[in-house]
């Protein structure tokens, strides 16, 4: 390992010793030796699966099969989140094939352009999944989100339930549209009064034109890359288009993977344990190596702190001295 990277990593470990230990103690206290729903009163448990189909009810009554929470940020106004409309059904089918059950446990506010008070909204997003996950119905969670402050907020939420294994599922990038040079040309003509508003709108709509993340390497696409580097989503899953057959296959594979990571599986790995100081350094390296969004110099600090890990901008600065820009 590069000596600077090792020094920064060890510095973060030492700085975070007390807060990390307190965090790990908290999530260890929340861990159970059986499925979480076994602790519920019968009335509460019956309420939790009342709307399920018969075979899912039987599975949940048995106390033997995993129940996986689906936390979604689907809406129709945000192109990167519109593909999530049909993900729950894909996930449920994949979970059934793995002898598990999937339930949509709740949603989060998901907007991007024009969202005011960005960091406050990130905190609201971080708190929203707690409503669904706090019912103690679930043995793992899948998080559907990709844009700007939504992924950082979801990560903070997942870490607040760090005793559960969690996997993030991206939606993938929008296909390329109108080339940037042409878009810039039309914007310039509009500024000069040589084309009207409709021409400008047609240009913008031809550029930002389909489901998926924006066609530039902004915060949303940085989210996908950083989360992949941190081991929170499947390798190679970031940049597959929403309508590609591979995207559906990756979504199903992510659902099956989280079942293997539960206490009933053979690869038990709660997110809070996996998300350690080395994972955080991997995230910073991913950001620096890919020339990602500088918004993550704020978001990664908050994400790490949610796991009891303390990083600061000196860590970013020192790592930036030795991490080459690859793309």
Regions found by a protein language model. Give the residues of each.
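Metallocofactor- and cofactor-centric catalytic cores in central/energy metabolism, strongly enriched
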Residues: 1-327
């Amino acid at each position: 390992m590069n000596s600077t990277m090792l020094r920064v990593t060890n510095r973060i470990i030492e700085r975070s010793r007390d807060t990390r230990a307190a965090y790990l103690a908290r999530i260890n206290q929340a861990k159970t030796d059986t499925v979480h729903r076994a602790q519920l009163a019968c009335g509460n448990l019956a309420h939790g699966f009342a709307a399920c189909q018969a075979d899912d009810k039987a599975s949940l009554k048995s106390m033997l099969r995993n129940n996986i929470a689906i936390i979604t940020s689907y809406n129709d106004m945000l192109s990167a989140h519109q593909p999530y409309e049909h993900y729950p059904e894909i996930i449920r089918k994949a979970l059934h094939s793995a002898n598990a059950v999937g339930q949509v446990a709740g949603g989060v506010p998901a907007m991007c352009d024009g969202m005011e008070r960005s960091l406050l909204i990130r905190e609201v997003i971080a708190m929203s999944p707690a409503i669904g996950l706090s019912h103690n119905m679930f043995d793992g969670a899948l998080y559907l989100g990709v844009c700007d402050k939504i992924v950082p907020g979801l990560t903070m939420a997942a870490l607040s339930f760090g005793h559960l294994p969690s996997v993030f599922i991206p939606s993938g990038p929008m296909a390329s549209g109108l080339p940037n040079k042409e878009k810039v040309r039309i914007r310039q003509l509009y500024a000069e009064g040589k084309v009207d508003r409709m021409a400008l709108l047609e240009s913008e709509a031809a550029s930002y034109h389909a489901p998926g993340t924006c066609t530039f390497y902004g915060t949303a696409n940085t989210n996908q890359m950083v989360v992949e580097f941190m081991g929170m989503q499947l390798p190679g899953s970031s940049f597959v288009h929403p309508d590609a057959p591979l995207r559906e296959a990756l979504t199903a594979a992510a659902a099956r993977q989280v079942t293997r990571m539960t206490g009933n599986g053979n690869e038990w790995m709660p997110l809070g344990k996996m998300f350690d100081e080395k994972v955080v350094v991997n995230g910073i390296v991913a950001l620096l190596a890919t020339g990602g969004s500088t918004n993550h110099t704020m978001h990664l600090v908050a994400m790490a702190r949610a796991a009891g890990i303390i990083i600061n901008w000196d860590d970013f600065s020192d790592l930036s001295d030795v991490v080459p820009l690859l793309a």
